[in-house]
Amino acid sequence: MQVTDVRIRKITNEGRMKAIVSVTFDNCFVVHDIKIIEGQNGLFIAMPSRKTPEGEFKDIAHPINQETRDMVQKAVIEKYEAVISAGE
């Protein structure tokens, strides 16, 4: 599986959330509402989630292994940094 497209849908400079993105896999499956968050150790992605009646947040869709999570995160952050650099 490959990341074939990353679209930065919204960029904000306020707070820890920096952007909302959509990621396409193999030109045939898209996941919307992935967030780019600024943490203590740099940028990371948060997968789309919903709040349960108990107040917990559960991912709607997410990678099931670290290798895939790293691949998606790398593609998303590289695209975000390219868009930010182009805008400066």
Curated annotation (Swiss-Prot):
SUPFAM superfamilies assigned: SpoVG-like
Record Pfam families: SpoVG (PF04026)
InterPro entries on file: SpoVG, SpoVG_sf
Alphabetical keyword list: Cell cycle, Cell division, Septation
Keyword Cell membrane: no
Keyword Plastid recorded: no
GO terms for biological process, alphabetical: division septum assembly; sporulation resulting in formation of a cellular spore
Family of this protein: Belongs to the SpoVG family.
PANTHER family: SEPTATION PROTEIN SPOVG-RELATED (PTHR38429:SF1)
Function: Could be involved in septation.
This protein's name: Putative septation protein SpoVG
Organism: Caldicellulosiruptor bescii (strain ATCC BAA-1888 / DSM 6725 / KCTC 15123 / Z-1320) (Anaerocellum thermophilum)
Gene: spoVG
